[in-house]
Amino acid sequence: MNLNDDTMAFLKARQEKLGGELIYKSYATWYGRTDGDKRDFGVFVYSDGRTLVLEDFERTPTILGIRYTPKKKSEYKKLEIFIPVEAICAIDRITRSSAEQSVRDGIDKGKAISLFSKLFRKTVTRIALEDGSAYYLEIADTDKLKKTLNK
């Protein structure tokens, strides 16, 4: 992978912030949380093995690649969440509809899904915490995340 200077500087700053090398990096195209927070745009996901970080960035909306300014501009609220890896009790895949219901209802109702469901339904990664809360991410590499964090 060929990374430009801005990307390299960004990753270096994140490593310095965590105090260790980033051993996991991914990008979630959808994000939800049992506290009702939901993002339909990307969230950067990274870890040094001790802490899992979810972070987003303010962006200009586009339609078919063309930037536009919405009439009602909602106030941007930065997402930057630090999750100690020891607080994570499970990482698995659930249906997106189950994740959306959990976000709406404020309680984690997700159950790991079968291979059949993985093939025929839209799925997301569920990160369940010991306190009963959960994060939901649409990422491509759930197995790599589980292996990296030993979950």
Task: List each language-model region with its residue ranges.
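Anionic N-terminal interaction surfaces
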Residues: 1-67, 75-78
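Acidic, Ser/Thr- and proline-rich intrinsically disordered linker/docking segments
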Residues: 3-4, 8-9, 71-151
